[in-house]
Amino acid sequence: GIDRITEISKSMRTFSRGDTATKIAFNIHEGIDSTLLILKHRLKANQSRPEIEIVKNYGELPEVNCYPGQLNQVFMNLIANAIDALEEGNSGRSFEEIKVHPNRITITTEVDGQKPKVLVKIKDNGIGMSKEVKEKVFQHLFTTKVVGKGTGLGLSISRQIVEGKHGGKITLISAEGKGTEFAIALPLT
């Protein structure tokens, strides 16, 4: 009990650490891990599906000069959207079917040495997106979620944080029935 509370408290401090006015050196893996801990309740098994698997392919990363709280918000938006896509894809599937073909989110980090930058890829094996949705997904107030579930701000804000505040790039690869991958490239300067 107490250990769990301590773990969550520490995670919340890591997650919100970045409301700084200037960029600071930050361990990206700590940010992702704290985000996963905060979202743990959504990843756990429930009556309709087994636990969502998280696969971490963490490479060796240097600390990144950034606004940690803002980047953590990006990780939160992308992972929460992946969970939503997986849950939507579970519609009409039995617990046993999902167990055989489990819901999975794969997070890969690496350094691209060509142009010194850190890459963070968040991929789900959910329902994927149509061409029409892909074209609009970063638009302000665009959402595919039912009223009350999504605001249409998450990906628009994520792009602004990655590209506007950090000089990075956020891209998307998705195909219907094949899942979705968001890739974040952050300069190492």
Give the role of each language-model region.
Residues 1-189:
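Core catalytic ATP-binding domain of two-component histidine kinases
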